[in-house]
Amino acid sequence: MKPSSASRFSLTFSHFLTLYCLLTQTHVAQGSHQWQSPIKTVVVLVLENRSFDHLLGWMKNSVNPTINGVTGQECNPVPNSTQTICFTSDAEFVDPDPGHSFEAVEQQVFGSGPGQIPSMMGFVEQALSMPGNLSETVMKGFRPEAVPVYAELVKEFAVFDRWFSSIPGPTQPNRLFVYSATSHGSTSHVKKQLAQGYPQKTIFDSLHSNDIDFGIYFQNIPTTLFYRNLRQLKYIFNLHQYDLKFKKDAAKGKLPSLTVIEPRYFDLKGLPANDDHPSHDVANGQKLVKEVYEALRSSPQWNETLLVITYDEHGGFYDHVKTPYVGIPNPDGNTGPAPGFFKFDRLGVRVPTIMVSPWIQKGTVVSEAKGPTESSEYEHSSIPATIKKLFNLSSNFLTHRDAWAATFEDVVSHLTTPRTDCPMTLPEVAPMRATEPKEDAALSEFQGEVVQLAAVLNGDHFLSSFPEEIGKKMTVKQAHEYVKGATSRFIRASKEAMKLGADKSAIVDMRSSLTTRPHN
């Protein structure tokens, strides 16, 4: 007998109701999963110019054998010779700085080959093309006991052994990717763009539009001010002096949802650089990481915190893992300058990346990415991509790159309760450098860029070639004083403008007053 129309309606409605309930439960479960993420505070520390193999490669031998590290069989040929130079474990204090420009990295990655498939066979060749003969230096890594803070963190928490810099190039483009998933077409330092400020949207803008707080704790200068938007008045109270505020905020449980820590970039007696940029002592970078960890470990926020430690780029040091070159999306349609017109379709060299949280299992090694596409990789754009997920931001992705990048929220998803056995303190660190900082040394390229940023904040960029020339003439000590003064002046003027009721989207336009302000 055929069912009546009423019974058919009842059956259909019943199926509809069941399906609706299932979909609703699934939706609620997914939403509640996002809402219940244990991480409420993400702390990011980006250090300078070290490759994975150089800093962490030897931990495969004595800390965790599952790490994709080195064995000592990794070698590079010496050009015009039958000799090779193989990777060793006797890295020490490095001076001068190995090559890491866009052109230098091309040579390191491709060697003398046709330039299509990375061989990682050109590090020695490139080092020999520069003054100082660093051909053996770039083929050396640190023993775990030489970087004891990292050895302990790798043992206790998570290391990512397939995390790459965002482009095969120097500091600034890669640092720009960390919080904006693009360098806006830059493959090197662009003076005009620096003066204007890079225009792209950042993860800070996304957080702000979603009413989620962030803070930048700086030691010399907040280099996040390379982004033009970050110079707006509305963000001026997000800038904090690290030495005055970080430990206090951590102790009070008042660290912002996204906490960015910037290291010291200038090497002074009694106040050494701790950014790990050669020729700075890596021991001081270890001390900074130890200080940050211990402040977080004793904070009321510890059980909801994820600390991300990474490096902007490899600094010219050898790494054996071939750089990805398939399926890498251009972030925003921009290309690099002539003559190469780089399409931003390749990643840079692998860099050390460590993550710390009581929600991470001991001895975790994260290697292959798990989407969102088959070609996705961990790279600096993974940071804004993951922040978007963790904080359930309604904003769009910043670029095609962070939409593609692998995210790392899974690293804190395997425990049902936070660990209680995480160490309260990390090992003490012995200095590697036997001498004092060279305060009268000339500036590195990166330090010169920081001085030019300070010149913009100071209003001195209106004086034609002044920023470029002053950087060439300054010593490290003079640059530190200039940068410190410029930063303080800009922040003070911006806060005054806010008190006077200026438009929050405005940027204080400083004017130089060289007659009243000394420039050594």
Curated annotation (Swiss-Prot):
Give the top-rank taxon of the lineage listed in the UniProt record for this protein. Eukaryota
Top-level EC class as recorded in UniProt: hydrolase
Q: Which factors induce or repress this protein, as stated in its UniProt record?
A: Not induced by inorganic phosphate deprivation.
Q: Keywords in UniProt for this one?
A: Hydrolase, Secreted, Signal
E.C. designation(s): 3.1.-.-
**Stored InterPro entries:** Alkaline_phosphatase_core_sf, Phosphoesterase
Q: What is its main location?
A: secreted
The protein's location, in the record's own words, is: Secreted
The entry's cellular-component GO terms read: chloroplast; extracellular region
Annotated tissue distribution:
Expressed in roots, leaves, stems, flowers and siliques.
Asked if Signal is a keyword of the record, the answer is yes
GO molecular function terms listed in the Swiss-Prot or TrEMBL record: phospholipase C activity
Q: Where is the signal peptide, in residue numbers? A: 1-31
GO BP annotations, alphabetical order: gametophyte development; phospholipid catabolic process; root development
Q: Does the keyword Secreted apply?
A: yes
**PANTHER family tied to this protein:** NON-SPECIFIC PHOSPHOLIPASE C4-RELATED (PTHR31956), NON-SPECIFIC PHOSPHOLIPASE C6 (PTHR31956:SF2)
Family as reported in the entry's similarity comment = Belongs to the bacterial phospholipase C family.
Instruction: State what protein this is by name.
Output: Non-specific phospholipase C6
From which organism does this entry originate?
Answer: Arabidopsis thaliana (Mouse-ear cress)
| Source species taxonomy | Eukaryota, Viridiplantae, Streptophyta, Embryophyta, Tracheophyta
**Gene that produces this protein:** NPC6
